[in-house]
Regions:
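Intrinsically disordered, low-complexity acidic/proline-/asparagine-rich linker or regulatory tail/stalk regions
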Residues: 108-114
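Short glycine/proline- and charge-enriched loop/turn segments
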Residues: 52-62
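C-terminal helical subdomain
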Residues: 41-42, 61-103, 107
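Conserved SDR Rossmann-fold cofactor-binding beta-strand/turn motif
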Residues: 38-48
Length: 114
């Protein structure tokens, strides 16, 4: 989850941008809550999309099946949008139960020379 942790899979620019988006979302809520404007930072872990094919060691089909799916993210966005006006979901983390970063598999996707 690049918006929460620094890691080698996503790279410097992507991770920095994700951190900035979280700060922007918090700033929107801070500056505009009195106007009824709200923002939610949706922070997904690994989502099974084609972008994973660009990794040096793409995850297997079995690993992808265990990841958050595009439909899961869509359902979460709908949930956020359907909240009543008096509710602000500031930040939501959505990760798979079988989380590769917890079990160390994500670290194996980065080739290391050490």
């Amino acid at each position: 989850m690049a918006s929460q942790r620094v890691g080698g899979v996503s790279g410097i620019a992507y991770t920095s941008a994700k951190h900035a988006l979280n700060a922007m979302s918090e700033s929107i809520n801070h500056e505009n809550c009195h106007l009824g404007i709200r923002a939610c930072a949706l922070c997904p872990g690994e989502v099974a999309t084609e972008i994973l094919d660009l990794r040096p060691a793409p995850p297997s089909a079995e690993e992808r099946a265990r990841m958050v799916q595009e439909e899961d993210v869509g359902a979460t966005i709908l949930f956020i949008a359907q909240m009543p006006p008096h509710v602000c979901l500031n930040e939501i983390h959505i990760t798979p139960t079988w989380n590769r970063s917890y079990i160390g598999a994500a670290d194996r996707t980065i080739p290391r020379d050490d």
